[in-house]
């Protein structure tokens, strides 16, 4: 294990232990198999991988063996050069095809389909136009045979300060749910939950 991986594990494990001890379902963002093994061993349930389990050869095996849940995100390149890879012909169909392929790879590796969620990767290797094309066509992803997650919280808005984009985040979140998204990744959990509850009441869907 490289020193930076050891350092990350040392930083994360106490937090994971504390959250799991409080009964919280814990998700960890990582694309490194060693980190996955460590946090899953302490009770984390979900791995969120921006590389869709492609950066580390062992990651597929680790997730399958642990019977963990995983979020597969679309991204071209890596976090350092991803914005040099925005030359899409059809961003919606290309992202769909990538995620569809990664689902199949994961299932073939022994990961249960019920444990997989996909994320179109808003803001990752996409320019503003691409991002809004994806948001506009989210219903296109309903045909993928697993849960769908999106992270758009605080990414867009008239205010340049990300912390002041609550209204836009809630609006886009509700729109995403209406288009078939199952999971919202948000900063403002309480406010988003209240807005969703209000919308569900209006739609007579609250049980």
Stretch-by-stretch model annotation:
Residues 112-115:
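Short acidic capping loops at alpha-helix termini that bridge into adjacent secondary structure
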């Amino acid at each position: 294990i490289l020193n930076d991986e050891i350092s990350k594990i040392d930083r994360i494990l106490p937090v994971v232990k504390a959250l799991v001890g409080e009964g919280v379902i814990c998700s960890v963002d990582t694309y490194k198999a060693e980190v996955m093994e460590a946090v899953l061993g302490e009770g984390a349930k979900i791995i969120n991988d921006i590389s869709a389990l492609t950066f580390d050869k062992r990651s597929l095996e680790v997730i399958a063996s642990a019977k963990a849940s995983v979020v597969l995100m679309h991204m071209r390149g890596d976090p350092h050069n991803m914005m040099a890879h925005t030359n899409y012909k059809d961003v919606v169909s290309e992202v769909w095809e990538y995620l569809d392929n990664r689902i199949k790879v994961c299932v073939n590796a022994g990961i249960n389909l019920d444990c997989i969620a996909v994320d179109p990767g808003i803001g990752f290797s996409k320019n503003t136009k691409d991002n809004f094309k994806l948001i506009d066509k989210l219903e296109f992803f309903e045909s993928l045979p697993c849960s769908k997650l999106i992270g758009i919280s605080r990414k867009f808005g008239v205010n340049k300060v990300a912390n002041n984009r609550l209204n836009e985040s809630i609006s886009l979140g509700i729109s995403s749910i209406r288009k078939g998204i199952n999971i919202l990744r948000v900063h403002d959990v309480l406010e988003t939950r209240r807005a969703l509850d209000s919308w569900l009441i209006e739609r007579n869907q609250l049980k």
